């Protein structure tokens, strides 16, 4: 598993607004712009994420027949679980079918809030800033190569302006906002759902806070992240990196578990050692998927008991023996595939 594959995998867990943090938080802004004067910086300490014992993960426990699943339980209204992807084609628009699904739901729940209060923005920014320059941590050759690679993306300038001030984990997070010219964060499924929910004046909620998600990035060892960034630079994105997105866009959902499993396996072309690749794979599966699924389950149960709700989460959260489909079934819910939902027109 190399770090260009990691970006694809994280696209399937749909970090929503977090994927745009680098773009929206690093614009010149009096409150967030780097200060030239030497003033004491307010330190933000991220909370330790909730940890669980490592669990064997079987990608194929669920046949992903659809991206849309109905959640049913006696005495409760039906709700829906939609697997998403936060990357879309530039200028793509929401489909009438997805707009209708939002209309028939009384509440829309996404992974994180779409609205980020100013105080939270400041906390996120301060958490990302490092007192030690990234150049010093990486060395000039690797740092300059990273800058050059980031510069190849058309929306890279805000990240480049602050790159040297960020913790390595924050750089990894911010690279998730980088897009090819024909791709867009704004037309990712989650962002389209949020925009439509706002237009329809639907009550909205979330399964976790931005700070809670950042904490899972923060647990990665710094030297591992730097090695991953170097690997990402040395192995540029290729056409086959679009395979997962194309599978989702064309409704080939049953293929996604195998694609994800393959990308968590050893990759001989990577500059990362087998142990480093395994660390990244374990982090992605056990922290970014399994732990967060377990954190979310009580919230999903509580909301589903109140009203017909649309839960929109990254597709990878539906998969496997520790995915939301199986966790809900183990807790007395009937979870059935619905006809595939085309999310874009």
Q: Which positions does each model-derived feature cover?
A:
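Ser/Thr/Pro/Gly-rich low-complexity linker/stalk segments immediately outside membranes or between
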Residues: 26-40
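Short secondary-structure boundary/capping elements
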Residues: 63, 93, 291-295
């Amino acid at each position: 598993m190399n770090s260009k594959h990691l970006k694809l995998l994280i696209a399937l867990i749909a970090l929503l607004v977090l994927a745009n943090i680098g773009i929206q938080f690093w614009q010149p802004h009096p409150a967030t712009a780097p200060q030239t004067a030497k003033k004491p910086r307010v330190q933000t300490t991220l909370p330790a994420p909730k940890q669980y014992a490592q669990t064997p993960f079987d990608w194929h426990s669920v046949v992903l027949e659809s991206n849309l699943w109905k959640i049913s339980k006696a005495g409760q209204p039906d709700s829906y679980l939609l697997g998403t992807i936060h990357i879309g084609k530039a200028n793509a628009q929401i489909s009438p079918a997805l707009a209708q699904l939002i209309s028939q739901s009384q509440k829309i729940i996404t992974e994180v809030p779409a609205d980020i209060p100013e105080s939270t923005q400041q906390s996120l920014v301060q958490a990302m800033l490092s007192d030690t320059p990234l150049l010093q941590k990486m060395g000039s050759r690797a740092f300059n190569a990273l800058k050059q690679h980031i510069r190849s993306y058309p929306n890279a300038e805000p990240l480049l302006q602050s790159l040297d001030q960020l913790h390595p984990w924050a750089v990894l997070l911010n690279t998730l906002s980088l897009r090819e010219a024909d791709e867009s964060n704004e037309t990712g499924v989650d962002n389209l759902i949020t925009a439509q929910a706002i237009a329809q004046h639907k009550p909205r909620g979330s399964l976790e806070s931005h700070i809670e998600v950042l904490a899972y990035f923060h647990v990665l060892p710094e030297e591992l992240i730097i090695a991953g960034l170097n690997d990402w630079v040395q192995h540029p994105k290729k056409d086959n990196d679009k395979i997962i997105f194309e599978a989702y866009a064309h409704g080939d959902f049953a293929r996604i578990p195998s694609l994800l499993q393959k990308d968590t396996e050893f990759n001989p072309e990577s500059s990362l050692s087998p142990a480093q690749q395994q660390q990244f794979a374990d982090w992605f599966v056990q922290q970014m998927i399994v732990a967060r699924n377990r954190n979310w389950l009580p919230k999903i149960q509580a909301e589903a008991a109140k009203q017909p709700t649309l839960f929109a989460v990254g597709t990878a959260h539906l998969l496997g023996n520790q995915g939301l489909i199986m966790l809900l079934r183990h807790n007395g819910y009937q979870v059935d595939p619905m006809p595939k939902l085309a999310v874009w027109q």
